[in-house]
Design a protein with these regions (language model features):
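Phosphate/NTP-binding elements of NTP-utilizing enzymes
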Residues: 1-265
Length: 265
């Protein structure tokens, strides 16, 4: 959603050519009609640029002309489409799910897409994905950057913390400000299995500074007061961001539900 909002702003305020690459052509088509089109319609400035009548139906397809901007949604499994479209903004979405055959060699989807920005003085290249493994593309790209984490204020002491899983569950480098997710230690049975109901009821994040229990009801206000901070130097001009679902303030992403999902993996 954040990336879509950023691209929408560019289209409205800084007309651009955009290449949005998804794992497959089918996903690109679906994303265009079910995820992207609602963003355009919700914006009065962008909605007025959408064609009317019969042309509006064709507009929902993978190539769209929005005012002076052009946006193309393509699949990583279509090298010909990737190689023929210059773009100032390239979004590589869910790169860890790109087919193996589209990685490496002449048909490398990531390389082909990034080459499309060469003719622009101020290109933007964005890669995003849910990490799948430590040697996966998105994780390696994150490590090359300045590894920004979202610091939020503790609702009790006000000091900034990072919501995180305990060290034994993650390969992320520690910042020293982690508010680790914890639950009742007695939720683990003598046979090593977990009482998942007890885990869900007791899960919370613990402030490393004042030891306060951070609850789901605190998330919204904490997020509003948060700020992105780099935790490494990274390559010059290379920003990378990590934001786990622990920050999401929805009924599906409570500390308890996420802890249960985590333990069931």
């Amino acid at each position: 959603t954040v990336i879509m909002a950023g691209v929408a702003w560019s289209i409205a305020c800084q007309p651009s050519t955009v290449l949005w690459v998804l794992p497959s052509s089918d996903l690109a088509r679906s994303f265009s009609s079910t995820r992207w089109m609602p963003i355009l319609r919700a914006s009065p400035n962008l909605n007025q640029l959408i064609p009317t009548g019969a042309a509006r139906h064709d507009f929902a397809k993978r190539e769209q002309r929005v005012g002076s901007s052009t946006i193309n949604f393509v699949g990583s499994n279509s090298p010909a489409n990737l190689a023929s479209r210059p773009a100032r903004i390239v979004v590589l979405d869910e790169v860890d799910k790109f087919p193996v055959e589209s990685r490496g060699g002449e048909g490398d989807a990531v390389n082909l897409a990034e080459q499309r920005t060469k003719g622009f003085a101020d290109p933007k290249r964005i890669k995003t994905s849910t990490p799948t493994e430590a040697d996966g593309l998105i994780w390696q790209e994150f490590l090359k950057g300045d590894q920004r984490r979202y610091f939020v204020p503790c609702p009790v002491c006000g000091k900034f913390v990072v919501l995180a899983w305990s060290p034994q569950f993650t390969v992320l480098a520690k910042t020293g400000s982690e508010a680790f997710v914890r639950w009742d230690s007695e939720a683990r049975r003598p046979d090593g299995t977990w009482d998942l109901d007890r885990v869900e009821r007791s899960a919370h994040a613990e402030c490393p500074h004042c030891k306060a229990h951070i609850q789901d009801t605190h998330k919204t206000l904490m997020n509003r007061g948060g700020e992105w901070r780099p935790t490494e130097r990274g390559s010059y001009g290379w920003r990378s961001y990590h934001l786990p679902s622990l920050y999401a303030a929805t009924p599906q992403t409570t500390f308890g539900r996420l802890a249960v999902q985590f333990l069931q993996q």
